[in-house]
Amino acid sequence: MHYHIILTTKCNSQCKYCYEKSMNDFDADIEKKAKLDLSSPESSKIDVNALKKFIAKDKNPVIIFYGGEPLLQINKIKEIMNNIDVPYRMQTNGKLLDKLPIKYLNRIDKILVSIDGDKETTDRNRGKGTYDLVMNNISLIKENSYSGEIIARMTLSIESPDIYDQVLHLISIGFSSIHWQIDAGFYGYDYDKEKFSLFVKEYNNSIAKLIDFWMNSIRNKKVLKLYPFLGIVNSLLNNEKSSLRCGAGHSGYAIRTDGKLVACPIMSWVEDFISGDLNSEPKNLKRFPIAERCNNCQIKYICGGRCLYWSYLKLWPEKGNELICNTIKDRKSVV
């Protein structure tokens, strides 16, 4: 099982898709859609010995440091790593990557770094100077012999549908592992049918070009880890039925700052998705199936249901959700 440990809800960035949108969405009556639990503290108060006992009950645990920005809690990271010997991963904005000593970094076998493509796109989404700072820090940890996998974690905004150009830029500067997600359906106020319809058309065309590029790379015996493609291809080749690909609520959970476990870190405040606590048995944590809205979909087990948070809260109208689904159906048909 994978466990995202939310070390803090604080962040040292104010990204447009996260901070800015959350401020605009504050009065969107979200409490009418879900029962909220906002009781957990800002920074992690979990007892490391209790965490160690819980993790020991799992045969194949992986800990993922998460936030907010996890590197704002470097001492907590060190405390956990000094006491628990398991595989580690981390999702970070990369601004403080140079602050964690290399002996700890090298025990983190995958680091997902938030970067959206070229300098203009990244700085527009995440603030001026972000791109240069993040790339400098990545260079520093490589120079210090970081031996793990660095994954570019992109957020694709409606203003930037050309995933092809942005992914090729990241490849050109040294990334061979890339993941992305469309910023769509996560806030109640930002749906614009005309703009998003145009985005989907341009995005799907760009994805088709990117798949052609990826397949040509494979033919030339170079397999780029474009994770959204890898998952679909693996399912098609192995006739595999996939649940939510992120693992939320079946093979992955988040540990809140108060020690409660939830199905997914981005819904840590939704009471319905509290699944247990550090006294629970991992095998007995509450599980969440693919959403009912997906039951009659022909690619249900290829897509896996896209996102538990999105399908549960239904913040966009159904027309908007259908457009989101079309981006996945189009990707599957091209592959």
Give, region by region, the residue ranges found by the protein language model.
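Radical SAM enzyme [4Fe-4S]-AdoMet core and its adjacent flexible, acidic
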Residues: 27-29, 35, 128-135, 139, ...
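Radical SAM/AdoMet-radical enzyme domain recognition
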Residues: 48-64, 73-183, 192, 196-198
